Amino acid sequence: MNLLKSLPPYILVCSLILTLQPIQGLAQEASGASASSGAERDGQHDFDFEIGTWKTHLSRRLHPLTGSNTWTDMDGTSIVRKVWNGRGNLVELVADGPAGHFEGLSLRLYNPQSRQWSLNFANISDGTLAPPTIGEFKDGRGEFYSQETLNGRAILVRFIISQTTPDSCRFEQAFSDDGGKTWEVNWIAVDTRVKDE
């Protein structure tokens, strides 16, 4: 201890700097590695392709999980707006067809910790949010899952977004009442971007 007191202060400071320099370098390397790996896996911009106005063609199974294969078609418009600087978006869907008029709203929120999206859907007929479907995009395909009830039965819901290009995309919803062993598709939407005039 007496040796430290006898050294001039500038030598102590220089010794500390030289001693800590390798540690700071390691910390910078580690934080740089985690930042770059985090940036590679960040899905915050997964839905950027969809911002704008789209013409949509919907096919909907009228009575899912009943053995019925009766479908109805609808045509309409989907408007997608970015919110929260891209960490969310709002979808407004309006469509009409032989089965009537449909209006839906979807609030999609990105969770940066899990790097997943929650898709929260409501339609005008009941005015309530369905349980969110949770998932992510991998290799250009989005898969989202939830558990809901249909006619008093617990079911699984799978929502897939695929075939995404700057001007078109496909959405498919399916239900399973056997724990995901089999899936019955009940909603298909094909969207085509409305070009600016």
What are these regions (language model features)?
Residues 1-6:
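N-terminal secretory signal peptides that target proteins for export/translocation
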Residues 9-22:
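Bacterial N-terminal signal peptides
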